[in-house]
Curated annotation (Swiss-Prot):
Keywords: Cell inner membrane, Cell membrane, Membrane, Transmembrane, Transmembrane helix. The gene is wzyE. It comes from Cronobacter sakazakii (strain ATCC BAA-894). Its main location: membrane. It is found in: Cell inner membrane. The keyword Protease does not apply. This is Probable ECA polymerase. Probably involved in the polymerization of enterobacterial common antigen (ECA) trisaccharide repeat units.
Amino acid sequence: MSLLQFSGLFIVWLLATLFIGTLTWFEFRRVRFNFNVFFSLLFLLTFFFGFPLTSILVFRFNVAVVPAEVLLQALLSAGCFYAVYYVTYKTRLRTARAQAASSGGGLFTMNRVETHLAWMVMMAVALVSVGIFFMHNGFLLFRLHSYSQIFSSEVSGVALKRFFYFFIPAMLVVYFLRQSSRAWLFFLVSTVGFGLLTYMIVGGTRANIIIAFAIFLFIGIIRGWISPGMLAAAGVMGIVGMFWLALKRYGLNVSGDEAFYTFLYLTRDTFSPWENLALLLQHYGDIEFQGLAPIARDFYVFIPSWVWPDRPHIVLNTANYFTWEVLNNHSGLAISPTLLGSLVVMGGVWFIPPGAVVVGLIIKWFDWLYERGNHEPNRYKAAILHSFCFGAIFNMIVLAREGLDAFVSRVIFFMVVFGACLVVAKLIYWLLDSAGLIQPRRRRAAPLSPTETL
């Protein structure tokens, strides 16, 4: 990449970043938080944060990258995608009166006991899954020699990892029932502690830690306990923390220029794998478009082999197609194609505009559900709605990094398990109530004041 090419790319990157950043800032000033703000920040992080890191790698360490014209196509594709997404998100599908008329009632309600039972069931799902996985494998972080081994046949019970995450929605219910600064700090300590435990047991998976910390920060923004400046500082600390965990995961011991180089490429690959989109565009002529099949194939991993004995052992979703067919990488790891990359694999660049419309509608639905929780008079139902919305933040990160096919399968799995936990909680409540074990809460007598006597 020449200096002239870099200058052109920098101008496009700066304009696109200012465009998305300005819209996001106005939305933040208007509502402080919604899922459009979150997705916009996530989109900026995924497709634009990595450009400065790539530039330093090129000019400081002479790292080879794809041609500048392909990088330009990647930046323009991301900018155009966001423009279509934003118009879709801002398009009102119904009148305000119709939206208000549909905001009452609802199909379900929650009482105090059912809500507490719900978070206990979700926590039990997570803890039992972790316990069974640990009994089969021990602490994989200290047993395995490379991170790719966690996907090998040496590790059993891999499907259980999908249930670990439900510890976070459980703690979200606990927080939203109280919404105090003490409950907020308890959420951080409990979820990050659980994330560190799963990091050691699974052998280096950092997702639970990242998600817990991100939710903690956004709750702080909503409540006014964290300023945007504090959020930026916490983000820097988070990046450094994730780099340290990555070093431990891969067993790297680096210093000096090597440490700086390692920090740049690990941070880029962790937070902003935008070059993967450029790689797909570079090999565009070699891609056999997969259509919508990757969305269906991604559900295969949730089907037990005893239910489907002939289930394919290799799932050709967009991430695996990108890893095996484009990169010719058969190390056992699946490399993230990004949201736009998954659309390119499925249908080429013509899938990007309709994909942006679909994503806009998805984020619009989550914001509608979030607003329902904000205006819900039943605090227990509101806690469940907010727990569901914030718990789905992980799936939105999957959407931006892994692609639309991975998002669809994971969000449906999350909805099914979350809903099943609510059904189990209601069933337990019904059994307890039928046995006469549920008693109405008695109002406590007001304590005597120091001047009152019996």
